[in-house]
C-alpha cells in the first residue's frame, strides 16, 4: 500500500499532506539553522564523505558504500565507516564493530559492510561520536565514509554522494509520509555526485547497476551458479524487495515463492525455517544472510551483488577522494 501511495497510484497521499508539510517545514528549518551557523556542526580532523539518499526505501546505497570503500582501499587509502545502525540496539554507544558483533547490536548494514570490506566500522545515533571512536582506535584512518546521514547535519562533510533508484526515482515528489522524500529533489543541485541505480540516468548522473555474483551457502561458504539451485524460495528484507526477486529471475531462477520482508526486520530460526518446505532451497539477500548465518541450515543460500558504475565520472570521483584523503 505504501508503494502505491508514494507513487501516486493511490489517492490516499492527499490525506497525508498536512503531515508532509509539517515534515518539510521542520526538516527545512533544521538544514537552514546549520547553513546559517545558528547550529554548529562538528568537523572531523579528516575528510568525511556522506553516501545518502533523498528518499526512504531501498536505493542501492549500501552497495555504493561497499564499492567506494573497496575502491579507496585498492588505492592504498585507509577508510573508516560510520552509521546510525538502524535495526540494532547496543548496550552503549558508540559501538566499534568486531568479529563478534551481531546485527542485533549494530544493525544489518554495518555488519555487512564490516564483513565485506574489513574496514573499521562504528555505529552511533550521534555520528560524530562514531567518528571519534574510530580515530581513537585507528588513528591511521585517512577518510571517513558515512553510510546514510545526508540529513544528519550535525556532522560536517566534505563530499556528498546521493544514491537514487533510477526506476522509482522520487515517486509523487512529496515529503514523508505522503511521499517518499526526506528532502526535495532540488537538493541534488548542492551534492557532489548523483549515482542512479538502474533505469535511465539523466544528464550529470552516474549510471550504476547491481551485478549478482555466485550464490553462497550460509553454512559452508560453497559457491555455485544460482540458476543451479532448485525449488527456490526467495526472501528479501531490504528497502525494495521486488528488485531482488527481479535479479533472481534475470539470473534464470523462477522462485516457487517470493517473500518480501520489512527492511531491517529481525530474523530468527523458527520464522525463517517455516518459510521453506522439505526439498526447497532458501535464497536470500546478503543483508539477510548476516542476520541468519548463526542459525542457518544446509539449504540456505544468499546472492551477493556488487555495484558497477559506468562512464568517466567514477574515476574522477575516486581521484578527488584519494586526493582529499592523502591531504593534497
Swiss-Prot record:
Source superkingdom: Bacteria
Binding site for ATP: 55-62
EC main group: transferase
E.C. no: 2.7.1.130
InterPro entries recorded: LpxK (IPR003758), P-loop_NTPase (IPR027417)
Keyword Iron part of the UniProt annotation: no
GO annotations of cellular component type: plasma membrane
Reaction equations catalysed: a lipid A disaccharide + ATP = a lipid IVA + ADP + H(+)
Pathway: Glycolipid biosynthesis; lipid IV(A) biosynthesis; lipid IV(A) from (3R)-3-hydroxytetradecanoyl-[acyl-carrier-protein] and UDP-N-acetyl-alpha-D-glucosamine: step 6/6
GO biological process: lipid A biosynthetic process; lipopolysaccharide core region biosynthetic process
Keywords: ATP-binding, Kinase, Lipid A biosynthesis, Lipid biosynthesis, Lipid metabolism, Nucleotide-binding, Transferase
GO molecular function, one term: tetraacyldisaccharide 4'-kinase activity
Family listed: Belongs to the LpxK family.
Function comment: Transfers the gamma-phosphate of ATP to the 4'-position of a tetraacyldisaccharide 1-phosphate intermediate (termed DS-1-P) to form tetraacyldisaccharide 1,4'-bis-phosphate (lipid IVA).
PANTHER family: TETRAACYLDISACCHARIDE 4'-KINASE, TETRAACYLDISACCHARIDE 4'-KINASE, MITOCHONDRIAL-RELATED
Protein name (record): Tetraacyldisaccharide 4'-kinase
Organism of provenance: Escherichia coli O6:K15:H31 (strain 536 / UPEC)
